[in-house]
């Protein structure tokens, strides 16, 4: 849906230049775009929205929020979904199948609510999160032959 709604955006380049991109130049795909690795920061966005019934829209929004609250560990800080969905599998199901739900490194923990999320249960460092991701990848690959690809991107001193 989002790909169809976005018309253009203004973004900031690494050199400080403001640039306008049209939808066709954003390379929008499944959990990917020029913004993910391109050094661009979105500063404004133009969307094409359809008019709709306010009550229906509110009902749909409330339903989506309730489903997220039930399935995702929104009560803890996290970077969202930790791994991309491997073709033919669900990352969370593979992680759970391998007995990793609830496992932790330092303050980073595989969520008990949804194994596809690494949460910060208090004091987690980037090193904790990276170590836990590595532990998950190793065990899932050893047991299932599936290499989970992180969706999380590390930036900064410890980002490598």
Predicted feature residues:
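Phosphate/pyrophosphate- and phosphate-bearing ligand-binding catalytic cores of soluble enzymes
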Residues: 13-134, 138-139, 143-160
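Short, small-residue-biased leader/transition segments that mark boundaries at the very start
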Residues: 2-7
């Amino acid at each position: 849906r989002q790909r169809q709604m976005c018309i253009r955006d203004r973004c900031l380049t690494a050199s400080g230049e403001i640039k306008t991109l049209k939808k066709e130049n954003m390379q929008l795909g499944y959990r990917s775009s020029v913004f993910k690795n391109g050094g661009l920061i979105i500063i404004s966005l133009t969307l094409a929205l359809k008019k709709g019934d306010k009550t229906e829209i509110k009902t749909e929004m409330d339903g989506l929020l309730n489903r997220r609250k039930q399935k995702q560990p929104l009560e803890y800080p996290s970077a969202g979904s930790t791994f991309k969905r491997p073709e033919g599998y669900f990352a969370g199901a593979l992680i759970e199948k391998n007995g990793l739900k609830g496992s932790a490194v330092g303050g980073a923990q595989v969520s008990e609510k949804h194994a596809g999320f690494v949460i910060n249960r208090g004091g987690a460092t980037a090193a904790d999160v990276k170590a836990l991701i590595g532990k998950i990848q190793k065990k899932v690959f050893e047991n299932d032959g599936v290499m989970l690809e992180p969706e999380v991107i590390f930036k900064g001193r410890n980002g490598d």
